[in-house]
């Protein structure tokens, strides 16, 4: 009969109007001082066919009244026992608590359901293995500020003051803003900066903003957290860096409100290639051109992405004013991507960079740059001649033209294009050193001799004449006559004097007549 009664009670969703109080009591569907009770829906009940309550609210009320029978009925209707126990604790109906005590494995589970601080503390006291700090921790988790207020003096006691930091961190992790503010206004927090790390990790801008309010409005004003201007700026810059690393623009904007450096924010954003942040700050903070160029230098130095470089260049319309500084960074940090971007926009800084490379860098760096930008040998050699880099010219020209005759031929052609005398002399000296290092064919030496005559290279020509006379003797007659004609035409007296000397040798040897000389 009992199981049938339970089955009826569990499944009755409608009570006939003619059920008497006695019948309802017999069925167990009567609540003392409230009237008939039955299920209205799966998770609610109806009292006296009028008042509708959720099953858990009804359990809370039944627990407060200590009505074990109604509690059993509501549990049959799938209510949560925790609410009955909370109600019983509130009104100290401990007999009901004792009856169900064994069914509760962890009393902490009930705490989030409790609104009343006194009941909250009573419930926590039932966890016999827990201490005072555990109570405070759960008060923070469950947003029970009144308990912290109650035990403020205990928290200030030297024995447990060190626990304030962990409670503060717990409040931050659980977003208990009211508790965070109260702690900031009433308790000494050893490391309040923890709020910023938590806010950034959880991407919680409200918590992040509260951190600044806490430090700069509450704690600093009260003297519990003193900051010099330098330390303040260091803190702000640190949080800017953390926010940029995560790409959190609202956090950066919030930091700028408290005196954070927009230039530092832009620098971090450039290094981390955070283009949306860069674009927002440049447009909203009216960043001047000079600052943008400095950011461009930083981007080159840190080898930022193509998109970041493009963005920065777009702000200055791809026109760089401080070319010298940009070139220095390109060379010093071997960062050439910006040159390629500028080339695409018809802005050529390759020559300027090549000049600095030739002047200050190694053979390997120069060769790599020449290959990367497909620079013509003539352009490189002219720059190297201007910078007087003979070893560099010799090494790279040997890479380009392995055959010494071919090398001399091309270098001679470049001499023709050099417009200043000292440059021509410098390159002719290099050509002569190549001649001295290799054994050239006779016809190539003859061509070189004529070349020397045309450019009045007296010493080198004299050297060749000596070689030709010793090794070819009178066979060089035709060359000497041709050189004499050129020297007359160009009015090179020193060359003419050298040639005349060897023509006299030819005449003495009977290899030439007066008529041929005339």
Curated annotation (Swiss-Prot):
UniProt repeat feature ANK, residue ranges: 54-83, 129-158, 261-290, 292-322, 324-351
The family this protein is said to belong to: Belongs to the asfivirus MGF 505 family.
Originating organism: African swine fever virus (isolate Tick/South Africa/Pretoriuskop Pr4/1996)
Name the UniProt record assigns to this protein: Protein MGF 505-6R
General function of this protein: Plays a role in virus cell tropism, and may be required for efficient virus replication in macrophages.
Keyword Repeat included in the entry's annotation: yes
Transmembrane helix is among the record's keywords: no
Keywords: ANK repeat, Repeat
Taxonomic superkingdom: Viruses
């Amino acid at each position: 009969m009992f199981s049938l009664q339970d089955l009826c009670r569990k499944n009755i969703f409608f009570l006939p109007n003619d059920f008497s109080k006695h019948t309802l009591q017999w069925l167990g569907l009567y609540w003392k001082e409230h009237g008939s009770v039955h299920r209205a829906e799966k998770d609610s009940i109806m009292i006296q066919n009028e008042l509708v309550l959720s099953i858990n609210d009804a359990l809370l009320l039944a627990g407060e009244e200590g009505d074990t029978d109604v509690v059993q009925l509501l549990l049959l209707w799938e209510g949560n026992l925790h609410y009955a126990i909370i109600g019983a604790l509130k009104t100290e109906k401990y007999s009901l608590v004792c009856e169900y005590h064994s069914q509760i494995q962890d009393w902490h589970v009930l705490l989030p359901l409790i609104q009343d601080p006194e009941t909250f503390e009573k419930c926590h006291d039932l966890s016999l293995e827990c201490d005072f700090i555990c109570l405070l921790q759960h008060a923070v988790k469950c947003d029970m500020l009144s308990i912290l207020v109650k035990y403020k003096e205990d928290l200030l006691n030297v024995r447990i003051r060190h626990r304030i930091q962990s409670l503060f961190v717990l409040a931050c992790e659980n977003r208990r803003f009211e508790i965070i503010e109260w702690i900031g206004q009433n308790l000494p927090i050893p490391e309040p900066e923890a709020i910023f790390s938590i806010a950034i990790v959880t991407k919680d801008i409200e918590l992040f903003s509260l951190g600044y309010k806490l430090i700069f409005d509450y704690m600093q004003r009260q003297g519990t957290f003193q900051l010099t201007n330098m330390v303040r700026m260091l803190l702000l810059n640190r949080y800017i860096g953390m926010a940029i690393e995560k790409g959190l623009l609202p956090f950066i904007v919030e930091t700028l409100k408290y005196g954070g450096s927009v230039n530092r924010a832009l620098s971090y954003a450039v290094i981390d290639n955070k283009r949306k942040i860069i674009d927002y700050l440049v447009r909203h903070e009216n960043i001047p051109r000079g600052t943008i160029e400095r950011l461009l230098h930083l981007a080159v130095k840190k080898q930022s992405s193509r998109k970041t470089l493009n963005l920065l260049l777009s702000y200055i319309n791809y026109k760089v004013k401080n070319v010298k500084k940009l070139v220095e960074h390109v060379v010093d940090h071997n960062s050439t991507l910006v040159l390629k971007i500028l080339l695409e926009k018809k802005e050529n800084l390759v020559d300027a960079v090549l000049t600095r490379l030739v002047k200050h860098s190694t053979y390997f760096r120069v060769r790599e740059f020449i290959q990367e930008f497909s620079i013509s040998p003539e352009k490189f050699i002219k720059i190297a001649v201007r910078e007087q880099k003979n070893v560099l010219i010799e090494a790279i020209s040997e890479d380009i033209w392995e055959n010494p005759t071919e090398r001399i031929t091309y270098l001679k052609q470049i001499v023709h294009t050099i417009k200043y005398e000292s440059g021509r002399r410098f390159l002719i000296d290099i050509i002569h050193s190549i001649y001295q290092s290799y054994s050239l064919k006779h016809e190539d030496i003859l061509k070189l001799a004529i070349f020397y005559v045309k450019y009045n290279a007296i010493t080198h020509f004299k050297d060749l004449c000596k070689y030709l006379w010793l090794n070819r003797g009178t066979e060089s007659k035709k060359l000497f006559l041709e050189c004499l004609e050129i020297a007359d035409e160009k009015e090179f007296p020193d060359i003419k004097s050298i040639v005349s000397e060897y023509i006299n040798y030819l005449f003495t040897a009977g290899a030439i007549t007066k008529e041929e000389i005339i």
